[in-house]
Amino acid sequence: MIVIKDAHFLTSSNNLSQCPASLTSEMVILGRSNVGKSTFINTLLGKNLAKSSATPGKTRLANFFSTTWEDKENALTTTFNVIDLPGFGYAKVSKSLKKEWEGFLWELLSVRVSIKLFIHLIDARHLDLEIDKNAKENIQALLRPDQAYLSLFTKFDKLNKNEQHRLFLNAPKPFLINTIHFNALSSKYPTLEIVRQTLLKYLLTNPL
């Protein structure tokens, strides 16, 4: 069983000089505006740390959280940072501001050696959006041998049973389906525990 022993806010940053020192492995969580990043982070960590914005595209900071995970089965306790990046793909953000943040976003992803896992949240109802395809291509182009990319589908509970089954069978791997808030869980779909185990496995594969 994976238990989140501690989770707290570290800092917010809009440039590399404001980012905390790279002292521990980190996972990046990114996705389109309103894909459910804040909800996912808060549920994953068991604490209301990430704030949801009522206005898509409003969040313009990279938020850093320190987390301590305990794997009770293997008697292992380890600390990771979670980085919540600004949502992308919202058309009403001014072009100059959007360009500025995309520059910081990709600069952060390309130079920060402590990043070990990219978690790309994708709305399960909209699997073929060009912005998500481009984001995936950009991330995978940046990947070092000690890094991993993982798709995680949100809004799974908005699909009917046939759509859920089809997504589970056909989604490109590696992927997870966020069923944390799904009431009628089937044993074949991930639970919160399986999501945590999977992320911990990725992070421990290539420690800092």
Curated annotation (Swiss-Prot):
GO terms (molecular function) for this protein are: GTP binding; metal ion binding
- The residues the record assigns to binding Mg(2+) are S38, T59
UniProt-listed InterPro entries: G_ENGB_dom, GTP-bd, GTP-bd_ribosome_bio_YsxC, P-loop_NTPase
Q: Does the keyword Nucleotide-binding apply?
A: yes
Q: List the disulfide bonds.
A: none
- UniProt KW keywords: Cell cycle, Cell division, GTP-binding, Magnesium, Metal-binding, Nucleotide-binding, Septation
Q: Which Pfam families match?
A: MMR_HSR1
- Give the residues the record marks as binding GTP: 31-38, 57-61, 84-87, 154-157, 182-184
Cofactor (UniProt): Mg(2+)
Report if keyword GTP-binding is assigned: yes
Annotated EngB-type G domain ranges read 23-205
Q: Which GO terms describe its biological process?
A: division septum assembly
Cellular component annotations (GO), alphabetically ordered: cytosol
Give the family per the record.
Answer: Belongs to the TRAFAC class TrmE-Era-EngA-EngB-Septin-like GTPase superfamily. EngB GTPase family.
Stated role: Necessary for normal cell division and for the maintenance of normal septation.
> What is the protein's name according to its record?
Probable GTP-binding protein EngB
> Which source organism does the UniProt entry give?
Helicobacter pylori (strain J99 / ATCC 700824) (Campylobacter pylori J99)
- Report which gene this protein is encoded by: engB
